[in-house]
């Protein structure tokens, strides 16, 4: 079947008000860019005429500004799921302008298949190659592309020359059956391949191919500083000690690491610690730091959903694909984040918290309990199922006016039942095998900033102690209330709650 090449504007014109569109990508890697940019123009033109124009968006995770950002500014998004990092989208969500469904990334594809979110009208898929018989070779991310391609009535392909055809073969495309026919996902080590390197679709569904040359809108992160370096070193020291004790096998276990400066500092510290052997990663996102560790021989293999790297780094991977081909694989997000596989492989998860409380509950999504930051992402997929689950964060923020450790988190994402270890620059709180009272003691002694230790000890004195989990109901969120009132949690006055 002959391929039909159209412009981005022509492709965008196929999308109507009220449609749900499914996008490839996971982070800004591998997501639609050209068609969504044109779609924003259509929305603005329709709004100028007094006509409604909004759509629903289903993605693997966040996208770039040419999708989430430009469509938010055009007020073109009615509904979106899941995770995002765009500031304009965040503002619209917190203003109540967009219905945002913040679900676990591993569940996104299956919930779309189950019909929980409605019909997929059109899929927009970024590819490095597409063939007349319907083989779509994805670019730098897996996401939910296999599912939305299968369910969508029509498919638009953004054939992006910014992604080398050397990316062909990087992906392992596998979509599980739905209940009651689902079988085990047969991954027994991070390097296992169980699918095919492309998405096979009915070529009649491909209504247009848009040729682009649009690099991924990758973010770069600030260099490590003494604080993030200390957190990273604390993580590395803890894992090395656990290995020495025999809790972690001497061959080590696969790692999952989140995104950002702290994650990079953790990986850097692990790479430098030669008591930890070269290790594998079974994670959702591969950043520049992982690529450096692969080149240095410190990471033996990386399995992920996306290459969320700078464009120079990505081009280096494409140029050196002979080296990387047996060291990297990209999977759909329901496989990269599969709780089943995470538990089978014994993955050690390392994620970042916004705040944690005295008993090990973690908030990783909301500021002050009500304002969305980014979303839960894949942290829940890994945390509950990890061999060891670790959360990291600085002990304080805003020049010490905010403590990351509070009596009770203002929003619960990860419960005390799932969190094993909390690490700040102050130290490591090992919560494994401990009662709530023992966890509180470990967290205050090891993770809390000195400015807040006495404050939190004094909070515990408000409780009568005759409980499994000591909380003073009236005072549990007093530090948050004080922050809203005076701008500084240190000003909390427990005498008001006696």
Regions found by a protein language model. Give the residues of each.
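Conserved alpha/beta enzyme-core scaffold
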Residues: 1-498
